[in-house]
């Protein structure tokens, strides 16, 4: 077993949440700034924290905007679904004895809201959320925290994500990275493996 721990990002990797996230952010910005941003101008938000997203958009009252964003996202919760093959993949990995974990830029309250409803969520431990670290992707902090909590060495971990921020986080931590091509906007993001579909992971383990 080359890797002992298989670690996943959430948005764009485990769950298809792109449209709910983009439309809710667009709605927040319309409320706060009076401007309707094109959705394509907001895709940079994937892979970084909500706070960092709002900072880049020059929002002044970030706590209030975040609270509004949470409220609007709750209205779109039913639109967030697992990607095809994910449930089969996770069940297979669990039965095969791999440790499963999550590293996400979501705060824990959103992680529980968006992902906790899926029964496979109970298979993942540890889960590192944005509020668990001072550093966030693309810095190595989230993966270093994962190593601390899991006891795994960097050589034993494969991190799977959809964004360049995930890729850089893995690189900075010295961890191998697989790009979730099925949910990625950047198909040329540096990676050790490129996975067209979730079950393609089985061929590299």
Protein language model annotation of sequence segments:
Residues 2-88:
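N-terminal helical cap/lid subdomain that shapes the substrate entry/recognition surface
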Residues 5, 137-165:
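Conserved Lys-Pro-Asp/Glu-containing loop-to-beta segment of HAD-superfamily phosphomonoesterases
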Residues 41, 121-136:
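A short, structured active-site edge motif that brings together acidic residues
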Residues 75-102, 108-112, 140:
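Short, acidic loop-to-helix structural element flanking the phosphoryl-transfer center
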Residues 158-194:
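Acidic, Mg2+-coordinating phosphoryl-transfer loop and its flanking beta/alpha structural elements
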Residues 201-205:
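Short amphipathic alpha-helix with an adjacent loop that forms part of the alpha/beta core around
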């Amino acid at each position: 077993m080359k890797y002992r721990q298989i670690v996943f990002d959430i948005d764009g990797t485990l769950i298809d949440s792109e449209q709910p996230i983009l439309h809710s952010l667009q709605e927040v910005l319309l409320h706060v700034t009076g401007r309707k941003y094109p959705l394509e101008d907001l895709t940079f938000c994937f892979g970084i924290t909500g706070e960092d997203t709002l900072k880049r958009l020059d929002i002044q009252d970030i706590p209030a905007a975040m609270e509004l964003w949470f409220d609007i996202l709750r209205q779109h919760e039913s639109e967030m679904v697992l990607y095809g093959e994910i449930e089969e993949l996770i069940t297979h990995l669990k039965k095969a004895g791999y440790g499963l974990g999550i590293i996400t830029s979501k705060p824990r309250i959103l992680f529980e809201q968006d992902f906790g409803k899926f029964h496979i969520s109970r298979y993942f431990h540890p889960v590192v959320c944005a509020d668990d670290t001072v550093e966030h992707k693309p810095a190595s902090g989230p993966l270093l925290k994962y190593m601390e909590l899991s006891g795994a060495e960097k050589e034993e971990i494969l991190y799977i994500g959809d964004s360049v921020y995930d890729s850089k986080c893995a690189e900075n931590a010295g961890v191998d990275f697989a790009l979730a091509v099925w949910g990625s906007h950047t198909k040329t993001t540096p990676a050790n493996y490129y996975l067209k579909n979730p079950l393609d992971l089985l061929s590299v383990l």
